[in-house]
Amino acid sequence: MVAVKTMVEGGKATTGPPLGPALGPLGLNLGQVVKDINEKTKNFAGMQVPVTVNVIDPATKKYEIIVGVPPTSALLKKELGIEKGASKKKEKIAGNATLEQIKKVAESKRSALLSYNMKGAVLEVLGSAVSLGITVDGRDPKEVQKMIKNGEIEI
């Protein structure tokens, strides 16, 4: 079995690089593979999505497409409707999320995170918010993390 892993924009995969050069030599119908990828990733429009194409049997051209969960940063940016994070996190704020928005992103990433419970998942997403320069209910995400750990905020 041959596996081709790549990142594509949701619903906008093309037969060009990186998919074409990787899958072309395997003899697959690139148009059909791209159509299948776009169908499976259309809900992630505007976000980079990890995709794996497993060529199960090159002789029969049988393949499967596995779509991963977009990076936490992409989900946060989509949720807030922002293009990119703050370039200088200390001086500039890229956006402000509500705790509910953070929980929503944590829920959608739950299967891909290392956390055992929702509280841990929320703490991980808050870590990404720090990196992007996103505040949570007007507070620094690190402050919100401390409040959750101290039991001041229930998840």
UniProtKB/Swiss-Prot annotation:
GO cellular component: large ribosomal subunit
Gene3D superfamilies: Ribosomal protein L11, C-terminal domain (1.10.10.250), Ribosomal protein L11/L12, N-terminal domain (3.30.1550.10)
Sequence similarity: Belongs to the universal ribosomal protein uL11 family.
Keyword Transcription: no
Database matches in PANTHER family: 60S RIBOSOMAL PROTEIN L12, LARGE RIBOSOMAL SUBUNIT PROTEIN UL11M
HAMAP family: Ribosomal_uL11
Keyword tags: Ribonucleoprotein, Ribosomal protein, RNA-binding, rRNA-binding
Superkingdom of the source species: Archaea
Functional description taken from the UniProt entry: Forms part of the ribosomal stalk which helps the ribosome interact with GTP-bound translation factors.
SUPFAM superfamilies named in the record: Ribosomal L11/L12e N-terminal domain (SSF54747), Ribosomal protein L11, C-terminal domain (SSF46906)
Any GO BP annotation: translation
NCBIfam families noted in UniProt: PRK01143.1 (NF002232)
Matches recorded under InterPro entries: Ribosomal_uL11, Ribosomal_uL11_C, Ribosomal_uL11_C_sf, Ribosomal_uL11_N, Ribosomal_uL11_N_sf
Molecular functions (GO terms): large ribosomal subunit rRNA binding; structural constituent of ribosome
Assembly description: Part of the ribosomal stalk of the 50S ribosomal subunit. Interacts with L10 and the large rRNA to form the base of the stalk. L10 forms an elongated spine to which L12 dimers bind in a sequential fashion forming a multimeric L10(L12)X complex.
Name of protein: Large ribosomal subunit protein uL11
A Pfam family: Ribosomal_L11_N
Organism the protein comes from: Picrophilus torridus (strain ATCC 700027 / DSM 9790 / JCM 10055 / NBRC 100828 / KAW 2/3)
